[in-house]
Structure formats: C-alpha cells, structure tokens
Amino acid sequence: MSLITNAKLYPPRHPRAVHLAHHLAAIAPGVLVTAAIAAAAVGLRAIPGMPGISPMLLAILIGIVAHNGIGTPSWAVPGVKFSLRRVLRFAIILLGLQLTTAQLIEVGGEGLAIIAATLLATFCFTVWFGRVLGVDRKLTELIAAGTSICGASAIIATNTVTRADDEDVAYGVACVTVFGSLAMVSYPLLQSVLNLDAHGFGLWTGASIHEIAQAVAVSFQGGQRAGEFGTIAKLSRVMMLAPLVIGLGMLARVRAKHQPAGDHTATPPMPWFVLGFVAMIGVNEFVAIPHEAKSWIVAITAFLLSMALAAMGLETDLRKLAARGLRPALLGLTASLFIAGFSLALIKLTGWHG
C-alpha cells in the first residue's frame, strides 16, 4: 500500500521535463558568464571617455581576452554556445520592433543590387584567390561563404554541403570572427574620413561586415539611423544564405555524381529568425507600442546582442589562425578587404545615399 500511496503522491517525472531540466542546468552557467561580460561592457561605458564605444564591441573584446588569456571553462561551453546561437537570434528578432516597413523600403532596388553584387563578387573572388594561394577547396568555400554572407552561421550552413573537416570549420569561424572584429574597430573610424552619411555607412556595414551581431554593433556606432539601416541591409544579405547553399549543394552533387557510395544531397537551412525579424516589423507597424516599452526593448536588445558578442569572443581562439599556416589566414584577410573595398566602391560610384 505504501508503494502505491507514494506513487500517487510522487508520480514519475515526464522524460521531457527531466531532459529540459538537465538542459537548463547545463546552459545556465555559460549564459550567466556571457551575461556578466555584457553587464561589465555596459558598466564600462560609465568610465570617462568610454560612452562612445559600443558595449557590443567591448563585450567581444573582453571575451577574446578572457578566452585566449585564461580559457573558457568546459562547464561554460554549453551556455556560451546557447548565447551565440539562440540568444543572438532572439535579439535579432527583437530588433524588428525598432523598425518599420517604411524603413525597409529605404534599401530600395539599388541598395539590394549593391548587396547582391557585393556578395557574389566576394564569393567568386575568394574562391579564385584560394586556388591561387593553394588553400584547400573546402576551407576556401567556407571562408568565402562566411565572408560574403553572415560569418559563422554561413560557414556552418555551407558545411552541410561542403562537408569539410571540423578543423576547417573551426579555422573558418575563427578567421571571419577575428577579421570581422577588426572591422568593428576600424569602420567607425573611417565614416567621417570616407564622408559617408548615416544611410551610406549603414549600407556599407550591412553589405560587408561578416557576422550579424558585428554588423549591428558597428552600424549603430554611426548613430540610430545608421544602425537601423545597417540592420536591414545585413538581414537582406542573410536572406541570400539559402540560395547560396542550394547552389553549392547542386555543385557538390555534380562533383560527386561519379561516387556511387553515399548520398551527397543536403537540405539547405532556412535562417528562420529572419522570418521572426520580419514579423516583428509587422507588429511594430500595426500595434501601438508605448514609448517607455520601446525604450526597454531597445535596452534589452542591446544587452542580448552584447551577450552574443561576448559568447563569440569566448569561442575565438587566436591560435587556430596559426594552426594551419598563414595562407588561409591571408585568404580571409584579403577577402575581408575585398568585400569592404568592393561594397564601398559601389556605394561611391553609384552616388547612393538611400
């Protein structure tokens, strides 16, 4: 009777509930670490001379120094990965609440043409220059995708069809993260030198900087309008990820048609958070959000993006750039310079101002 009574009083926990509890326990420490770094980055802005520096930029720098100085503890890794993926995507979705369809239309056909031309030219140039340098084809394609579209997310998505070694994936991610971080430092310094207005600077950052969070952080360094426009431009670029992966998948199947063993088809991933971003723009268009609530949303979004940048820093191992020699690193650097120069040239040649 006692066993029956105990079974009624303490029914067995549902397996899904147990799994969820274990998952939350695994990611909590790392999420707290990224939140602490984000809080420190926000707090550092109170220091005289620091207010003009984005907390997102400070967060990734703190993360890089911490990871390469003392290392990221193993117990924090699950939460760090969660912040880099889920938290980042949720923050991007929330960014939609700061935008309207009128702003979305501002990119226009010419702006989209600049973004598309930059993407295609950068990918083709990187693949060609990789052959010139003698870099492995798979690693070259990963660096090309990461540089031309959206950094680590594009590399991971592209690898579903490229099927490179884990070391190549790690190298490519480190490459685009490091050179994207350098762009975060240099771009704001060049805005006035290059005589770019808010729209021009936003388009330049959105069309050329690798990671979404990096592009958002840099574009907002040029002001609210530049930040909003840079976000739209960058998300427009991300939408081109699926077509690129489809094209690479078709190319991979052509290469593998004489290999009878193994199915080389792959379903290209859809960056679903882009749909959430667009949905939030629609919400902002048709729902009257109080000004005070919008202020909180802006602050929360910036904090979540800082968490994602902190996680990116905590996964950036500078030694990985040296592990496979200098040629792939040279390829990544050259590709980064190419996309910056090509997109800027198109903006200047077309006289684009939004």
From Swiss-Prot:
Family annotation (InterPro entries): UPF0324_pro
Family listed: Belongs to the UPF0324 family.
Chief localization: membrane
Pfam family, one: Cons_hypoth698
Membrane-spanning residues: 21-43, 58-80, 87-109, 113-135, 142-164, 169-191, 235-254, 269-288, 295-314, 329-351
Domain of life: Bacteria
Organism: Rhodopseudomonas palustris (strain ATCC BAA-98 / CGA009)
Protein name: UPF0324 membrane protein RPA1770
Membrane topology qualifier: Multi-pass membrane protein
Subcellular localization(s) per the UniProt record: Cell membrane
Keywords: Cell membrane, Membrane, Transmembrane, Transmembrane helix
A GO CC annotation given for this chain: plasma membrane
